[in-house]
């Protein structure tokens, strides 16, 4: 009987790294592979990965951005320690391949894999490559990317996303029977985006007879943002305010348009369902979210509003100049940019390059 192949996944820190990696892991599990995970104890993967039935091991590593001089001076020691911890785990687990999908854990894990002779397959989720992935690309056996701008010669495969997003009805079917108020979904991510939470209620007050709104405000913000809607005179039966949304596929499919940040996973989830967006990119020196948003905006599937330019006037102007015919055209373009076989393609590359 042939021995089962094993993949070590290195991904952590944010949902943008962890969820695409889970999608690939689940695909390979169906192909008979064993999966183990390398993460850190204090980030989201520590709770999330075991919930999906995947065993996880931990190394000690954290980012250096914003740290003091003491942390910077100790960084070489901390990195060497993390590499040795990862090497010990790799020698014990004996994976046939390692998949790096971002987060602090990927750096030491990738170096340790190279030292152990295990092939490293890298996937960059964003339109701009993170520093860790830039370094790892020099030792990786294969480099894959979601968008065509991160690496000059890497294969573009899209971002692996949950399959339930692709099972939603196509835009033509969803929009066919829609009449009445435009459906606006506001999503700030798991933490809520403060700028959206503070701007949208004022916009809603000026379009109360034109919009139906679902607003996900993040943990601990429902009471405050509900009060803000009430203060602006925008609170009504057509406004639903929640901390979190459990079924994002259904929420995206319900919406005529989404107002949100433009993390890589969000952009690819919207494309998977085929839902237009108004993106408000998070401000970052490398313009990562802006370039993610351009992937859909450049084909007419989304609008971009820079955070410095965001106010109620801008949102009112955008929404009053969009009708369902235009929104359907945007939705169709978004769907055309989706990558339904991203998880499968990443898995195929792993299988092709495994020891």
UniProtKB/Swiss-Prot annotation:
Pfam families: Glyco_tran_28_C (PF04101), Glyco_transf_28 (PF03033)
Subcellular localization, as worded in the UniProt entry: Cell inner membrane
Enzyme class: transferase
EC number: 2.4.1.227
Record has Transferase as a keyword: yes
GO BP of this protein: carbohydrate metabolic process; cell division; cell wall organization; lipid glycosylation; peptidoglycan biosynthetic process; regulation of cell shape
Binding residues annotated for UDP-N-acetyl-alpha-D-glucosamine, in chain numbering: 14-16, 126, 162, 190, 245, 264-269, 289
Record keywords, A-Z: Cell cycle, Cell division, Cell inner membrane, Cell membrane, Cell shape, Cell wall biogenesis/degradation, Glycosyltransferase, Membrane, Peptidoglycan synthesis, Transferase
Mode of membrane association: Peripheral membrane protein
One CC-aspect GO term: plasma membrane
Gene Ontology molecular function: UDP-N-acetyl-D-glucosamine:N-acetylmuramoyl-L-alanyl-D-glutamyl-meso-2,6-diaminopimelyl-D-alanyl-D-alanine-diphosphoundecaprenol 4-beta-N-acetylglucosaminlytransferase activity; undecaprenyldiphospho-muramoylpentapeptide beta-N-acetylglucosaminyltransferase activity
Involved pathway(s): Cell wall biogenesis; peptidoglycan biosynthesis
Protein purpose: Cell wall formation. Catalyzes the transfer of a GlcNAc subunit on undecaprenyl-pyrophosphoryl-MurNAc-pentapeptide (lipid intermediate I) to form undecaprenyl-pyrophosphoryl-MurNAc-(pentapeptide)GlcNAc (lipid intermediate II).
Family that this chain belongs to: Belongs to the glycosyltransferase 28 family. MurG subfamily.
Protein name, entry field: UDP-N-acetylglucosamine--N-acetylmuramyl-(pentapeptide) pyrophosphoryl-undecaprenol N-acetylglucosamine transferase
Organism: Mannheimia succiniciproducens (strain KCTC 0769BP / MBEL55E)
């Amino acid at each position: 009987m042939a021995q089962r192949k094993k993949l070590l996944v290195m991904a952590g820190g944010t949902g943008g790294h962890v969820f695409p990696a889970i999608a690939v892991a689940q695909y390979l599990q169906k192909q008979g592979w064993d999966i183990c995970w390398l993460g850190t104890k204090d980030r989201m993967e520590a709770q999330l990965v075991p919930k999906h039935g995947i065993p996880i091991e931990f190394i000690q590593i954290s980012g250096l951005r914003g740290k003091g001089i003491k942390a910077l001076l100790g960084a070489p020691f901390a990195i060497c320690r993390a590499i040795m911890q990862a090497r010990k785990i790799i020698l014990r687990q004996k994976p046939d391949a390692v998949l790096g999908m971002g987060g602090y854990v990927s750096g030491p894990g990738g170096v340790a894999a190279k030292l152990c002779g295990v092939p490293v397959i890298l996937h960059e989720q964003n339109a701009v490559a993170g520093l860790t992935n830039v370094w790892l690309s020099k030792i990786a056996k294969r480099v894959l990317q979601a968008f065509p701008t991160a690496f000059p010669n890497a294969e573009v495969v899209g971002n692996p996303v949950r399959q339930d997003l692709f099972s939603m009805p196509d835009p033509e079917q969803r929009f066919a029977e829609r009449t009445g108020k435009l459906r606006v979904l506001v999503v700030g991510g798991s933490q809520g985006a403060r700028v959206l939470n503070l701007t949208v209620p004022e916009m809603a007050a000026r379009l109360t007879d034109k919009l139906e709104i679902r607003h996900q405000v993040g943990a601990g913000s429902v009471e405050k943002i509900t009060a803000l809607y009430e203060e602006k005179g925008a609170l009504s039966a057509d406004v639903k305010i929640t901390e979190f949304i459990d079924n994002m596929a259904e929420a995206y499919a319900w919406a005529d348009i989404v107002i949100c940040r433009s993390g890589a996973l969000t952009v690819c989830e919207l494309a998977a369902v085929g839902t237009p967006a108004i993106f408000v990119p998070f401000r970052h020196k490398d313009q990562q979210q802006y370039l993610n948003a351009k992937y859909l905006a450049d084909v007419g599937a989304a609008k971009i509003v820079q955070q410095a330019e965001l106010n109620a006037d801008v949102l009112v102007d955008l929404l009053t100049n969009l009708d369902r015919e235009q929104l359907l055209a945007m939705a169709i373009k978004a769907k055309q940019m989706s990558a339904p076989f991203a998880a499968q393609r990443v898995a195929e590359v792993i299988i092709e390059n495994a020891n």
